[in-house]
Amino acid sequence: MITREFDTIAAISTPLGEGAIGIVRLSGTDSFAIAQKIFKGKDLSKVASHTLNYGHIVDPQNQEVLDEVMIGAMRSPKTFTREDIIEINTHGGIAVTNEILQLAIREGARMAEPGEFTKRAFLNGRVDLTQAEAVMDIIRAKTDKAMNNAVKQLDGSLSNLINNTRQEILNTLAQVEVNIDYPEYDDVEEMTTQLMREKTAEFEELLTSLLNTARRGKILREGISTAIIGRPNVGKSSLLNNLLREDKAIVTDIAGTTRDVIEEYVNIKGVPLKLIDTAGIRETDDLVEQIGVERSKKALQEADLVLLVLNASEPLTDQDKQLLEISQDSNRIVLLNKTDLEEKIELDQLPTDIIKISVLHNQNIDKIEERINQLFFENAGIVEQDATYLSNARHISLIEKALESLQAVNQGLEMGMPVDLLQVDMTRTWEILGEITGDAAPDELITQLFSQFCLGK
């Protein structure tokens, strides 16, 4: 693979702030030469590739030593970008990493754009678009299962599936072309209407099966959106804090203290649960609280799971009954809190599968996690170890468009259209799938995607 010609770029690859180590990364033809200008140690042009080399970063203008470093020297093409890469490992800190970055830029490097290292890896054929996107998914993964799914995508699980499907579609199109251009070739099977119907059904089944993983993939990537609802002061925020095992929401005895929607994540069996602590849903004249209530209602409508909290020490109120009614069609778990107090709630008016808890005394909180696991994981088989899951909205949209093109082929077949006239829609399916891997993606899309990456990646 011949890499494209680019100027040499540089960026800080570690988070800005104090830390044990900071890394300034360079990529491009002049990486070694630029690093050598500011490095006092071994001659980098002579060191073996993929080695760490001890020395100091020195300002060539005044010979001031900036830091004691280890330099990682990696020669193309066996690097992430398939270009020469230098990684300067410094002591962590904002000042020292910035000083070294500015030195590299002064000596000939250019400040990298967000995601430019990964973009070069894509443009140089090191990764395709799905693998590049997987890099960001790994960075943003909140649990081990989300990370594992992203790692599989980085390893090419989705790419291989899409590429194999595209190849089968291309073979079908080639067969049609041969039938049209060389009808005298008896050794090539004729693409009959029936055979085209079978091929189309095969492609549809494969893409539909992949699309059906989108819900699971979304959960792995974004978490189970979980709204904690209940009238004011029944213990919603205390439950949130208990699940998180830290204080993040405001907990007081004053009704209405949660005036907004608070979002936090908790790890349930390796899958992120996005907990949304809502303001108590009640009528109020307080404008700020009204906004929180409206957001709570919206969160309830959009939630994958609803945790409805009721107060066991009080009879059911009209608000409780309203919440039971509006959440009955949701994926819901009803929680009876404050069971350490005298029970006054009417159990005969509640669902039979309630969970009795005491947030104050941390009683039966583990049963909530068990019920969530049953609802989403055990019953639904949510996460299979070796499966490939669609988790990217762009991929999902393109698979849906590809299926629409295949449905157009089917409609044409039902109408009795000749096979050769259906090539347009079949070709469109092939092109759409190419947008997923980047083989047929427009430059504007590629630029937009990589602009979402962080600097230094």
From Swiss-Prot:
EC number assigned by the record: 3.6.-.-
Any GO molecular function: GTP binding
UniProt binding sites for Mg(2+): 237, 258
Sequence positions that bind (6S)-5-formyl-5,6,7,8-tetrahydrofolate: 25, 87, 126, 457
Positions contributing to GTP binding: 233-238, 252-258, 277-280
Main subcellular localisation: cytoplasm
Record-linked SUPFAM superfamilies: P-loop containing nucleoside triphosphate hydrolases (SSF52540), TrmE connector domain (SSF116878)
One GO-annotated biological process of the protein: tRNA wobble uridine modification
Cofactor: how bound: Binds 1 potassium ion per subunit.
Matches recorded under PROSITE patterns: G_TRME (PS51709)
Cofactor: K(+)
GO CC, any one term: cytosol
Enzyme class, spelled out: hydrolase
Domain TrmE-type G per the UniProt entry, residue ranges: 223-377
Keywords of the record: Cytoplasm, GTP-binding, Hydrolase, Magnesium, Metal-binding, Nucleotide-binding, Potassium, tRNA processing
Gene3D superfamilies xrefs: P-loop containing nucleotide triphosphate hydrolases, Probable tRNA modification gtpase trme, domain 1, tRNA modification GTPase MnmE domain 2
Chain residues that bind K(+): 233, 252, 254, 257
Subcellular localization, as worded in the UniProt entry: Cytoplasm
Assembly behavior: Homodimer. Heterotetramer of two MnmE and two MnmG subunits.
Family according to the record: Belongs to the TRAFAC class TrmE-Era-EngA-EngB-Septin-like GTPase superfamily. TrmE GTPase family.
Name of this protein: tRNA modification GTPase MnmE
Gene: mnmE
